[in-house]
Design a protein with these regions (language model features):
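Short, charged/polar low-complexity linear motifs in solvent-exposed/disordered segments
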Residues: 39-40, 51, 84-86, 103, ...
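Mid-chain, well-packed structural core segment of small domains
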Residues: 76-100, 104
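Short, intrinsically disordered/low-complexity patches at protein termini
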Residues: 44-46, 56, 69, 84-85, ...
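HotDog/MaoC-like acyl-thioester-processing domains
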Residues: 1-19, 96-148
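Intrinsic-disorder/low-complexity coil detector
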Residues: 42, 92, 132-134
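Hot-dog-fold acyl-thioester-processing enzymes
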Residues: 1-83
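Generic structural detector for well-ordered beta-strands
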Residues: 21-25, 91, 143-145
């Protein structure tokens, strides 16, 4: 869960290698709510029988549901309040299901102070029963404008 307190970082406060993370327990209700909100009611996301017939364990969470969780990290933790998302590129190498515990991580890869631009690396992995990293479920890059 993302805390309600928003971080307020100026471009000069953001350093290479800075990391923000969260652990998220995926709930079936979130998948259903996202299907309604987005209008993406593809049976792969909302029909367990169909998803299983297609070779999946159950309904697959929308990739952009993970993207929305990353958005919460950007807007609340790193870079925080002054973040204006300009570009987001994500790949989803493995499926996510209700009940999965996902570790999302954002890392500062580059800071262009003169332009007010920050590049972030994003990753998400399933956690095992022992909180060990498992398969990667999302990876990508984000470019944010840091407002003054």
């Amino acid at each position: 869960m993302i805390e309600d307190k928003v971080v307020d970082l100026d471009i000069t406060d953001i350093e290479l290698g800075t990391v923000a993370s969260l652990v998220w327990q995926v709930e079936a209700e979130e998948i259903t709510a996202f299907a309604e909100l987005s209008g993406d009611r593809n049976p792969l996301h909302v029909d367990g029988e169909y998803a299983r017939s297609a070779g999946y364990q159950s309904e697959v969470a929308h990739g952009m549901l993970l993207g929305a969780k990353f958005s919460g990290l950007f807007g609340m933790k790193l870079p925080g309040k002054r973040c204006l998302l300009l570009e987001q590129t994500l790949a989803y190498p493995n499926p996510v299901y209700a009940g999965d515990q996902i570790a999302l991580k954002v890392e500062v890869r580059d800071v262009h102070s003169e332009l007010g631009i920050v590049e972030l690396k994003v990753t998400a992995e399933k956690l095992s029963d022992f909180d060990d990293p498992g398969p990667q479920v999302a990876r990508g890059k984000v470019i944010c404008k840091i407002l003054s």
